[in-house]
Amino acid sequence: MVDYIQRPKSRFLRVKCNDCENEQIIFGSASRKITCVVCGRTLAEPTGGKSTITTHILEVLE
């Protein structure tokens, strides 16, 4: 059977900070700069659409 329900293109991401190894959940289409809550390193920057992720993505959450 065909699935006719549209799914959103934006996703939540589980990422790991490269400096302090902290795991954090962020929004993939964030409109503001996202920083690590522990060390303050930039994890993602907005680009007008999807964010530019500057760290390691562990998992894409549904």
UniProtKB/Swiss-Prot annotation:
Binds 1 zinc ion per subunit. One of its GO terms (biological process) is translation. It comes from the Archaea. Zn(2+) binds at C17, C20, C36, C39. One of its GO terms (cellular component) is ribosome. InterPro entries: Ribosomal_eS27, Ribosomal_eS27_Zn-bd_dom_sf, Ribosomal_zn-bd. Keywords: Metal-binding, Ribonucleoprotein, Ribosomal protein, Zinc, Zinc-finger. The keyword Zinc applies. A zinc finger (C4-type) spans 17-39. Its cofactor is Zn(2+). One of its GO terms (molecular function) is structural constituent of ribosome. SUPFAM superfamilies: Zn-binding ribosomal proteins (SSF57829). Part of the 30S ribosomal subunit. Belongs to the eukaryotic ribosomal protein eS27 family. This is Small ribosomal subunit protein eS27. It comes from Methanosarcina barkeri (strain Fusaro / DSM 804). The gene is rps27e.
